[in-house]
């Protein structure tokens, strides 16, 4: 009889759950005997970020129709077990509402109300998504094939090593001292705590010296929001998604209410409870992420993707021996699509924005975009737009992400008025959906991210381009535009600002400790007003996803043993390599399929194995998820329901490749 293979999966959140699901499905087909040890101090399925006991005010950043941990039939070669087949979050949600699916434990009334209020386009509470993940895990566990067994260890993995002479090649140690033997180890670690940056350490030290309160970056569900005082100034650094979570807890979470504005259907009115702190927020761009447009699906149905396609990138690969560059090869194609979709919608909805007939303009624009004349196309578009489009209606992509860059304000009140006007316009655009040119340009960027993830994973770009162009420049730009919250959050922020609950510092603020006055001080160089002083400062951001800064006994000990290392990237000739944020792994980012004569996009998913200190590939230690940020981009984005494996479901395809590799040993 073939011996049983033992697999330790470290991390029981979505990526670890995918590993379990794929191992189970593959083992059911091959009849291989497998024992899975699932290790995580948090509950299996939901894990840390999606745990089911968190506030229902914390929302996902994707609508109900988007996320899944189960690939559609036919996507991965071997379908999931029958009990979970095709079970995306949206299908699970509908099943719970109509009574055909029973949650693992009974929903309380608040959960039931939240679930029944959702539509496929609404953004669900994270705790409700955790309920889905919990159900998937429990259903898998209850219907394991006879050749598969599973043990859950509610503990932290703290070490792993190679056992040269033992029956099983590896051992994984848990907090408390238990050691688990393994033939293979899957690192699906998810979000980890991280060491603070030097400036943050200075704030910690200053707070300790003067009795101030400083909250470092954390997962929002872990923060003790009730500790923040009523009616005192609280500085908040960061205006991304965690900022929305902070606002929800400090307003609705304290009894405040939002109601429709009877005089303006696009606005809300906030009724304070009196228990709110005085929130003063700041970030580099000075504004929150732009709201997502209201669409009938995740992508705009009328969006035209003409230039940045897998076929176009394939042509680049087939006609050049050079490694791709983001700035030279990919970004121009992405910009072309954004320009085309912006002006196409502008011509349809606002023909008076053109000095010449809108149809004539589009024909000229089309000709320029189709002409492969290198970098000159951009200057030609700029000249055409300058001559043909009314000022104020021209697309300025960089200004979209930083609307107040290099703009001076005389007071906080003046800046707040400008921000509220900006928020109202953003809400108006989101509610127009596919009739808004700006939102369609942003939707084009959002669609490009899916194609870009495939290109980067399968073809790759140069190290210098990865570090300096993709991660440093493009990533913050596109996140501020395409990774924004639901429009409800921007409506709420505008209402809170009108109610005087929230104020803004301005772009590029500095946060320091004034040791003479014994308080935090924050000010923006672009707003000429008295600096804001406070005894409370919170970082509205999650810990950095960076293996060199992450606090993980497991990774630290594996690094000391030489089993893992961070990936180094060569950014320019003769310069010292820089450390990237992810682990070094063995799967090449440039896949060569010799049967087809070269790299063929859309055909590759990978079983990523760790690379150790001496360039040695460890054959039985695999990586899934966030720690792959050196070879994949957008690693925190969930798998997309009903998407092809090489596009929106790549995380599931990678888990499938890992399962195949493990069972083939």
Language model features by range: what are they?
Residues 1-54, 116-664:
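Flavin (primarily FAD) cofactor-binding/catalytic cores of flavoenzymes
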